[in-house]
From Swiss-Prot:
Keywords: Chaperone, Endoplasmic reticulum, Repeat, Signal, TPR repeat. This is DnaJ protein P58IPK homolog A. Interacts with BIP1. SMART domains: DnaJ, TPR. Residues 357-423 form the J domain. It is found in: Endoplasmic reticulum lumen. TPR repeats lie at residues 36-69, 70-103, 116-150, 152-184, 185-218, 231-264, 269-302, 304-336. May play a role in protein folding in the endoplasmic reticulum. One of its GO terms (cellular component) is endoplasmic reticulum lumen. PROSITE patterns: DNAJ_1 (PS00636), DNAJ_2 (PS50076), TPR (PS50005), TPR_REGION (PS50293). Its main location: endoplasmic reticulum. Residues 1-28 form the signal peptide.
Length: 476
């Protein structure tokens, strides 16, 4: 090692950048060109290059040879302050003031040191209180101003940025740290987490793995790595089961995946969508709506989630909601014929929901036979004949009109088939009031012919009083 003292400076300098041990410099200083003044000068050059570790080693070497070198104490204090080794820096400033009392500039530097030290302590306190914005204020505005090479502050800053979900900046900040020290485990962990929360799982995994190669028992790296591995495995199981048609198992897998990390929104958006699709296929519309809504809360531009929620609303017979979602999806993706087809179905169902339910008016099921339809019509026509309801004639006329219109459609097999298919019929009153609906008591309009074998008995109302059996009457 003594031979090292004979090495030229161009060879020695790179080694100085890597070592700060006083022992190293004891050997180095034996060279004829490595006297304290030369080492001190080179230390200042290193400081100007922001090579603080190298300059610290040189200053240590100076003070080994010349313990009362006041400027070496001052400059070493400055380097230590830069690296936020505040207690050591304070000792060096105090030593300088012993050697040269009354230096206002050094007293100012000491004051800045104490200010940075207090700010770093406050930043840690704010981090524990989860006030991450204040953490950044203390670090950026004070600590890193006076201690620009403070690794603790840089790591705390990265943690605060991670908590604030500023993942891109975390990647940038930890990148600077790893450029100086590629094996920094804290930086590898933080950078891996940032990539993880950006859903770049492959890159995240590589960071975790590198850290674990350096320290296989690092608890946080192990937790992050195996947590990611389990998440990917469970997600794949959900997707595989969905592809195989094992929909109930797939739904449970998706739910289990979502429970692993509720804060992983950039990834969970796809899990919510996958779950929604499976629930739609299972016919569980209400649950599907909830899952797709969660996806849209994360990414409101996710067309697939809008489409699937529209399909889910069709299952719950929320026709208007389905049309709204599918129309928005169609606007965002106008070339998608699948969305257009779904929108047409939703619009048809909405239209059908607003038309008259002739079966309900006659009080019969949709599977009623022609004979049952006729019997129901006869019964209701007698019940609501206006001449039999003089005290509530207006209500009776309205009901009789509805009954007549219902029978006009359901009593005709062709019209009934078309009605059941959801087709529009000009002859039908599709509901909503107004227009050319059937009105047997008004002038003009449509003409309906009713055949009734039993006859209306009793007088009043219509011309001729009661009607004999086998009669025919027209409303024009």
């Amino acid at each position: 090692m003594v031979a090292m003292a004979r090495w030229p400076w161009r060879v020695l300098l790179p080694l100085l950048l890597l070592h700060s041990s006083p022992v190293f410099f004891v050997f180095a200083q034996e060279g004829q060109d490595n006297d304290p003044s030369t080492l001190f000068k080179r230390a200042l050059e290193m400081m100007n290059l922001r090579k603080y570790d190298g300059s610290l080693g040189l200053l240590n070497a100076v003070l080994e040879v010349e313990p009362n070198h006041s400027e070496a104490y001052r400059q070493r204090a400055s380097v230590l302050r830069h690296k936020c080794r505040y207690k050591e820096a304070e000792g060096d400033y105090s030593k300088y003031l012993e050697l040269k009392p009354g230096s206002s500039s050094v007293e100012k530097e000491l004051s800045q040191l104490l200010q940075a030290q207090n700010a770093l302590e406050s930043a840690y306190g704010q981090f524990e209180s989860h006030d991450f914005s204040k953490v950044l204020d203390y670090i950026n505005k004070i600590v890193l101003v006076f201690s620009p090479d403070c690794l603790k502050a840089k790591l705390l800053k990265a943690k605060a940025l991670l908590a604030l979900k500023d993942y891109s900046t975390v990647i940038s900040e930890t990148g600077f740290i790893l450029k100086e020290d590629e094996d920094n485990l804290d930086a590898l962990l933080l950078r891996g987490r940032a990539y993880y929360y950006l859903a770049d799982h492959d890159v995240a995994s590589r960071h975790y793995q590198k850290g674990l190669r350096l320290d296989p028992e690092h608890s946080e790296l192990k937790k992050a790595y195996f947590g990611l591995k389990n998440l990917v495995k469970k997600t794949k199981s959900a997707e595989d089961n969905a592809a195989k048609g094992k929909l109930r198992v797939s739904a449970e897998d998706y739910k289990a995946s979502l429970a692993m990390d509720p804060d992983h929104t950039s990834y969970n958006v796809h899990l919510y969508l996958g779950l929604c699709k499976v629930l739609v296929k299972l016919g569980r519309g209400k649950e599907a709506i909830s899952s797709c809504t969660e996806a849209l809360n994360i990414d409101g531009e996710l067309v697939d989630a809008l489409t699937q929620r529209g399909e889910a609303k069709l299952l719950t017979e929320d026709w208007e909601g389905a049309v709204q979602d599918l129309k928005e999806a169609a606007q965002k993706s106008p070339q998608d014929m699948g969305i257009r087809e779904a929108l047409m179905r939703a619009e048809k169902q909405l239209k059908l929901s607003k038309r008259k339910d002739w079966y309900k008016i006659l009080g019969i099921s949709k599977t009623a036979s022609a004979a049952e339809i006729k019997r129901a019509y006869k019964k209701l026509a007698l019940q609501w004949h206006p001449d039999k309801n003089v005290d509530k004639r207006e209500e009776a006329e309205n009901m009789f009109r509805e009954i007549a219109a219902a029978y006009e459609v359901l009593g005709d097999e062709d019209k009934r088939v078309r009605y059941d298919r959801g087709e529009d019929l000009d002859e039908m009153n599709m509901g909503g009031g107004g227009g050319g609906g059937f009105n047997p008591f008004g002038g003009g309009g449509q003409q309906y012919t009713f055949h009734y074998d039993g006859g209306f008995h009793g007088g009043g109302g219509f011309p001729g009083g009661g009607f004999p059996g086998g009669f025919q009457f027209n409303f024009g």
